[in-house]
Amino acid sequence: MQVSVETTQGLGRRVTITIAADSIETAVKSELVNVAKKVRIDGFRKGKVPMNIVAQRYGASVRQDVLGDLMSRNFIDAIIKEKINPAGAPTYVPGEYKLGEDFTYSVEFEVYPEVELQGLEAIEVEKPIVEVTDADVDGMLDTLRKQQATWKEKDSAVEAEDRVTIDFTGSVDSEEFEGGKASDFVLAMGQGRMIPGFEDGIKGHKAGEEFTIDVTFPEEYHAENLKGKAAKFAINLKKVEERELPELTAEFIKRFGVEDGSVEGLRAEVRKNMERELKSAIRNRVKSQAIEGLVKANDIDVPAALIDSEIDVLRRQAAQRFGGNEKQALELPRELFEEQAKRRVVVGLLLGEVIRTNELKADEERVKGLIEEMASAYEDPKEVIEFYSKNKELMDNMRNVALEEQAVEAVLAKAKVTEKETTFNELMNQQA
């Protein structure tokens, strides 16, 4: 076997391989012997068919199969010998085959980039320092009460957190526009669902009033014909409701799994959940900064085959989220996923190099801790832990999570990490 390797473009490679004629003939004869042992031909007992008849009847197809097998096996031998690491599936380009002559073919593929990590010491990471305070717990209890609130109609004027039912008609330069009209529209105030100025124009009015408000569409508004335009909305305020918060009764508290129904028990449970969310948020915040710094410091070529593969993964995930099938997934435009796919491949290659250079392996104690942390959010943590322990795929996924964390920590060990005090709400709002 003769082998030559050339670079086509960037990460592209072409391996040209020549297989000696006698190697082909030896392999063909060997396979024909195997065929002769199995075939049945009228007039002959199984295994007793003369080789010339076997060759005459099956020679062409056997030779084709043998060539395909030799091409594959010789390519694998070649890349092992040349220490080449292909990325993605190779493309075989067969040359012209003539009986009794050497056979030359080529294989085209991409290789993984040679990554030499740099700039780790210049990466800057700001680690949030946060404590869950009693005031934070009070705020979360208010949120829980609001989520369980009922609405009661009122006669007084609209206030910041009320709910209103309105009819409205919007116009620009006295002309109504598409999507600017609705009847019995229910709007919870204070959630920022409408354009700036819309809610402010409703505050202070009472049910039964009809009025007009003036607003301006933002320059970044999605409808091109409305960007930056001044508009008027004719409003018919049909109903105003105020939120009635439930009291922290034992019955209410037990809805959240606090068996004794005490306020102290609920506060303890809420604090525990907040601290778990906080730990995850800090970890994610630090991780995202470390990875962003790693990517900026290391500009690497990315094999197109890996991007294509990642796009397929993202397509299928998107289709599953919206109830589509595999055929619909493949019809989604690749442009929707290309940037994200490339980013994921780059991050994977860089973290892979961090893992390789630091000779990292998944820490089983960390894996155990991650599973326990995740399970603590469920009603029966022991059941979840046991389920994971019996599922190899889930365990392998968690080992990958642990290994990624260890790689990020290796980056942080060399990066410039500073600490900054912040509040629970500030950090969680940044995550959102």
From Swiss-Prot:
Lineage: Bacteria, Pseudomonadati, Pseudomonadota, Gammaproteobacteria, Enterobacterales
Oligomer and partners: Homodimer and monomer. In vivo most of the ribosomes are in complex with monomeric TF. Uncomplexed TF, however, is in a monomer-dimer equilibrium with approximately two thirds of TF existing in a dimeric state.
Presence of keyword Membrane: no
NCBIfam families xref list: tig
Name used for this protein in its record: Trigger factor
GO biological process: 'de novo' cotranslational protein folding; cell division; chaperone-mediated protein folding; protein transport; protein unfolding
Catalytic reaction(s) noted: [protein]-peptidylproline (omega=180) = [protein]-peptidylproline (omega=0)
EC code: 5.2.1.8
Main location: cytoplasm
InterPro entries: PPIase_dom_sf, PPIase_FKBP_dom, Trig_fac, Trigger_fac_C, Trigger_fac_C_sf, Trigger_fac_ribosome-bd_bac, Trigger_fac_ribosome-bd_sf, Trigger_fact/SurA_dom_sf
Molecular-function GO term, any one: peptidyl-prolyl cis-trans isomerase activity
Originating species: Shigella boydii serotype 4 (strain Sb227)
Domain PPIase FKBP-type: 161-246
Family membership: Belongs to the FKBP-type PPIase family. Tig subfamily.
Gene behind this protein: tig
